[in-house]
């Protein structure tokens, strides 16, 4: 019986083009990449897209400070971000940019459709203005006290403590982040999206299970009051797309940023004719669409975005998967403590697969923060990957190469043990599918323990010294390497480079779930090369000091 291939589109949140990617960003990109690789390993068609979030006053000001046009800054950061994501083995089909003709075209299309439906209206508002810099202040360039929970030093549009969104004029004791001056009020006409028109649609969509229960419950709190209209415009000077037929008005970065997912696929469809844009985005599409995002941008993705898509006649996401923040050694990342670790700095010192594994061992389907404890990181990598997983192969491979010319036995001596490893496939794939990677890793490592216990019990090193035990040595090591093959298939979404090395060592086809059950018997393997290096205690110091 053949199961029909699923057609899946996966996105990760777009990194912002005014700073480097750090290990906090990597939680999401690794989480999404593991899921995509798992789907492909299962034989599903899975496209994976992302891109540079390129617009906003922050980009404009950063570019000015660096003496660059905004376009040049975006191009530079796009190159750096693509390098770092690639370094962590994040396998995007397209890593594009929101500053693109496709994104402009789609933003204008969605805006025009919403306007034609009567969902857009103009209103004169009082806005924060920096009298020193002579610029309207974007939300992120105003700091003050949250009007909802009273947390100090919060952004002008969203509170990182309670998650409230608000307008900058509601902030208590605001100051300009550009000059330190107290902003003055200045009137300006802005365009608003009538989000409240979509209240029932959003309630129904949230109730239908498209979000984790924690996220859905949090969002339902916002419906206790009417949803407020969303300000989708900004005044010049601004780096972004001009609003059609509105002089000196630009789309707010959060309007065109999620449309960047669509633009990235549209651009990919031009490069790859087999990719049909409408098949993934048209209303009523039978394909699957998943967004991986952090908990700080849930409001934009789970309220504004579905409403915009619905109003403009596009499909809604199948699910939005939300993750928590990263802490390092139990605390928020900090430059002064040396725990603000950029992706590039990490890659200068260590294999990306160590961090991919450590994150996988911590990630669940819950919206929980995860902690990168550097001592635990070293211990976990050494104990699990080196001590259990790689050790299994290195204990068996030498005998096969040296004593049997690389030839495996023609049968397995312990078929029941082999079958028991195969019987965990459904459990492990269910854990991957549901984003419970930590549970998958736990099962896989318990299998690695059992495989090593088998080798410990059979003692091929002792058998090799006995007379007439050659066949038994070959059989035991063949069993061990076939168990190692199963473990590698299970770990392949997390450790893609190591899996490739194992395929070369085992001299076999690409490992996947379709060929999982087939053992390698009467088969020649290549000489074993070391797969990973043990981490030294000074690793933590290398990562936390430039």
From Swiss-Prot:
Keyword set includes Aminoacyl-tRNA synthetase: yes
Position of sequence motif 'KMSKS' region: 332-336
Keywords: Aminoacyl-tRNA synthetase, ATP-binding, Cytoplasm, Ligase, Metal-binding, Nucleotide-binding, Protein biosynthesis, Zinc
Reactions accelerated catalytically: tRNA(Met) + L-methionine + ATP = L-methionyl-tRNA(Met) + AMP + diphosphate
Pfam family membership, one: tRNA-synt_1g
UniProt GO BP: methionyl-tRNA aminoacylation
Record-linked CDD domains: Anticodon_Ia_Met (cd07957), MetRS_core (cd00814)
GO CC annotation terms, alphabetical: cytosol
Protein family: Belongs to the class-I aminoacyl-tRNA synthetase family. MetG type 1 subfamily.
Protein name: Methionine--tRNA ligase
């Amino acid at each position: 019986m053949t199961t029909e291939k699923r057609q899946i589109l996966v996105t990760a949140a777009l990194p912002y083009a005014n700073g480097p990617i750090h290990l906090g960003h990597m939680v999401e990109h690794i989480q999404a990449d593991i899921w995509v690789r798992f789907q492909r390993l299962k034989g599903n068609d899975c496209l994976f897209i992302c891109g540079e979030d390129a617009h906003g006053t922050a980009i404009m000001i950063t570019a000015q400070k660096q003496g660059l046009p905004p376009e040049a800054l975006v191009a530079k950061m796009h190159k750096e971000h693509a390098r770092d994501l690639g370094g962590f083995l994040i396998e995007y089909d397209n890593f594009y940019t929101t500053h693109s003709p496709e994104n402009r075209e789609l933003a204008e299309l969605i805006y025009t459709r919403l306007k034609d439906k009567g969902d857009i209206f103009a209103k004169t508002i009082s806005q924060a203005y920096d009298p020193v810099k002579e610029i309207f202040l974007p939300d992120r360039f105003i700091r003050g006290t949250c009007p909802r929970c009273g947390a100090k030093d919060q952004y002008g549009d969203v509170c990182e403590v309670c998650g409230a969104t608000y307008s900058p004029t509601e902030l208590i004791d605001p100051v300009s982040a550009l000059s330190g001056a107290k902003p003055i009020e200045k009137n300006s006409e802005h365009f608003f999206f009538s989000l409240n028109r979509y209240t029932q649609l959003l309630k129904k969509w949230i109730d239908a299970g498209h979000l984790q229960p924690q996220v859905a419950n949090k969002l339902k709190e916002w419906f206790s009051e009417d949803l407020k209209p969303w300000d989708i415009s900004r005044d010049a000077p601004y780096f972004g797309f001009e609003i059609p037929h509105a002089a000196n008005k630009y789309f707010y970065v959060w309007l065109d940023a999620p449309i960047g997912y669509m633009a990235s696929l549209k651009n990919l469809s031009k490069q790859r004719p087999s990719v049909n844009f409408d098949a993934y985005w048209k209303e009523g599409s039978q394909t699957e669409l998943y967004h991986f995002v952090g908990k700080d941008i849930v409001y934009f993705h789970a309220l504004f975005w579905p409403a915009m898509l619905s109003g403009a006649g596009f499909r809604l996401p199948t699910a939005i998967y939300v993750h928590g923040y990263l802490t390092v050694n139990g605390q928020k990342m900090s430059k002064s403590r040396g725990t603000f670790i950029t992706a590039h700095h990490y890659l200068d010192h260590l294999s990306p697969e160590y961090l991919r594994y450590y994150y996988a061992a911590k990630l669940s389907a819950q919206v929980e923060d995860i902690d990168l404890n550097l001592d635990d990181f070293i211990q976990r990598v050494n104990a699990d990957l080196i001590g259990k997983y790689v050790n299994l192969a290195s204990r068996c491979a030498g005998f096969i190469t040296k004593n049997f010319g690389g030839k495996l036995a023609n049968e397995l001596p312990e078929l029941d043990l082999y079958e028991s490893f195969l019987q965990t496939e459904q459990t492990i794939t269910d854990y991957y599918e549901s984003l419970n990677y930590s549970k998958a890793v736990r099962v896989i490592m318990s299998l690695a323990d059992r495989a090593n216990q088998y080798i410990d019990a059979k003692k091929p090193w002792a058998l090799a010294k006995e007379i007439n035990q050659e066949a038994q040595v070959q059989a035991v090591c063949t069993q061990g390497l076939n168990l190692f093959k199963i473990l590698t298939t299970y770990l392949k979404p997390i450790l893609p480079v190591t899996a490739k090395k194992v395929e070369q060592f085992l001299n076999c086809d690409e490992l996947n779930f379709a060929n999982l059950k087939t053992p390698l018997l009467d088969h020649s393997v290549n000489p074993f090369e070391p797969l990973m290096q043990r981490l030294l205690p000074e690793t933590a110091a290398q990562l936390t000091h430039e």
